[in-house]
């Protein structure tokens, strides 16, 4: 049968169908961005003579960049960074719970969340009768919520200037210091403007130039939540930030300064299973303060009662009295953790309560984290680093992120306080073997 030419209408319909199919494969529409506002400058004095002799560390976080994204998605700049230095091909272990604020702060203090004060993104403190929420600027900028000595405060206390283009805790005065240079969090600041600011800091006179710098990108966490870890949008976001790392690395190389570039993530991502698991369907939580899945009983009798109601309630979680939480979680020594504690057995979104009557009950996001990385390997984070102080072509087995703190402090020539981490874990990646006398 002879083929007949397509009509204009048919061609138009085919064009529309093709356009829609292509659009379905594209990442979500990027949000509007704007230039960076003026940097906040704290007068911590000039770099000491000793600090001016030290090398530089630029610590970058790619939020939610799961340990296997680089190889799965072909993140060529990150993989090249790993080949030029060191990386963790099987991932880095976040601290429990594998949320953003607890783990960013664990990285820069070397303290598990039970010791660093940030036991979750949002939690309640019974002694203060107050709540910490990452969306509350008055809490985020209040240094009394935070424990430990973050790397920027450690540097400032030893005469070395620091700068933070975002990092949880960097807007607060902690251990007596704020970074010499920092910005208030605003995720709409243009991605390239962030890199330009980092490079501008490195062009300052030696007396004012920060030797420790942080940089943060919220991607691909957002896409992982909205679309899931296997989505095309998540892949596109991962490759986008990989491109930014390539641009940053080229800019750092052009400074000809001795800079160690360290790229990490805070946690991974997994596909959310089923719908919500709502605890008040299994237990009477009357009289409890609750924040997400965290439960704060006002009396021992209430805590024991709710524990007994929950301990055999569902296969989707395990209930513990706080004192009985397995030691490997490092999550039993801070009252902010609540009591009893609920630990998910899989990728289940757990909450204490649903919305009030009459309000829509939205399903959980497509992707989630916060789970135990020892039970859920999808929670593992990423680690790449290269620079003049780091051995090239080295790979490391999975390690806990608290071990980064003494390692970065060593790169900067700083004396670090005792923490939950150890320089010994990553000493084999250092050209001087972690020997203080060699610095």
Task: Label each residue range with its predicted role.
Residues 111-228, 315:
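His/Asp/Glu-rich, glycine-adjacent segments
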Residues 288-395, 399-410:
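Active-site neighborhoods of enzymes that stabilize oxyanions during catalysis
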Residues 12-24:
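Bacterial N-terminal signal peptides
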Residues 53-57, 84-88, 157-163, 207-213, ...:
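Loop/turn elements at helix/coil->beta-strand transitions in domains of secreted/extracellular proteins
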Residues 2-14:
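Bacterial N-terminal signal peptides that target proteins for export
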Residues 33-54, 67-157, 173-174:
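Active-site nucleophile/metal-coordination loop of metallo-enzymes that catalyze phosphate/sulfate
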Residues 39, 52, 191-203, 213, ...:
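A long, amphipathic alpha-helix that forms part
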């Amino acid at each position: 049968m002879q083929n007949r030419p397509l009509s204009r209408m048919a061609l138009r319909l085919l064009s529309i169908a093709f356009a829609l199919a292509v659009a379905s494969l594209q990442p979500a529409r990027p949000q509007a961005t704007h230039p960076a506002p003026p940097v906040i400058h704290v007068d911590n004095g000039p770099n000491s003579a000793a600090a001016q002799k030290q090398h530089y560390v630029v610590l970058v976080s790619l939020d939610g960049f799961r340990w296997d994204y680089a190889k799965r998605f072909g993140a060529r700049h990150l993989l090249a960074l790993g080949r030029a230095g060191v990386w963790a091909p099987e991932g880095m272990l976040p601290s429990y719970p594998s949320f953003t604020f607890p783990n960013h702060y664990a990285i820069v203090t070397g303290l598990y969340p039970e010791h660093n004060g940030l036991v979750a993104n949002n939690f309640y403190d019974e002694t203060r009768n107050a709540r910490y929420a990452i969306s509350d600027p008055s809490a985020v900028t209040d240094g009394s919520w935070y424990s430990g000595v973050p790397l920027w405060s450690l540097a400032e206390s030893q005469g070395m200037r620091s700068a933070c283009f975002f990092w949880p805790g960097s807007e607060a005065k902690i251990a007596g210091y704020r970074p010499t240079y920092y910005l208030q969090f605003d995720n709409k600041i243009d991605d390239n403007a962030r890199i330009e600011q980092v490079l501008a800091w490195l062009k300052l006179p030696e007396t004012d130039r920060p030797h420790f710098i942080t940089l943060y990108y919220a991607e691909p966490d957002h896409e992982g939540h909205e679309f899931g870890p296997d989505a095309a949008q998540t892949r596109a976001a991962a490759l986008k930030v990989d491109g930014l790392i390539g641009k940053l690395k080229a800019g750092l190389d052009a400074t000809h300064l001795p800079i160690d570039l360290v790229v990490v993530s805070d946690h991974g991502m997994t596909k959310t299973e089923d719908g919500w698991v709502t605890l008040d369907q299994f237990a009477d939580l009357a009289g409890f303060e609750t924040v997400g899945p965290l439960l704060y009983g006002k009396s021992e009798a209430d805590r024991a009662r709710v524990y007994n109601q929950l301990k055999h309630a569902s296969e989707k979680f395990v209930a513990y009295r706080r004192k009985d939480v397995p030691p490997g979680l490092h999550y039993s020594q801070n009252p902010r953790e609540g009591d009893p504690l609920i630990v998910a057995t899989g990728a289940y979104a757990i909450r204490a309560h649903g919305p009030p009557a009459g309000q829509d009950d939205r399903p959980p996001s497509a992707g989630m984290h916060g789970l135990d990385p020892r039970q859920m390997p999808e929670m593992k984070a990423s680690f790449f680093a290269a620079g003049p102080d780091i051995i090239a072509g080295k790979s490391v087995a999975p390690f806990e992120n608290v071990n980064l703190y003494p390692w970065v402090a060593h790169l900067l020539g700083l004396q670090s306080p005792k923490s939950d981490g150890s320089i010994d874990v990553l000493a084999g990646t250092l050209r001087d073997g972690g020997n203080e006398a060699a610095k």
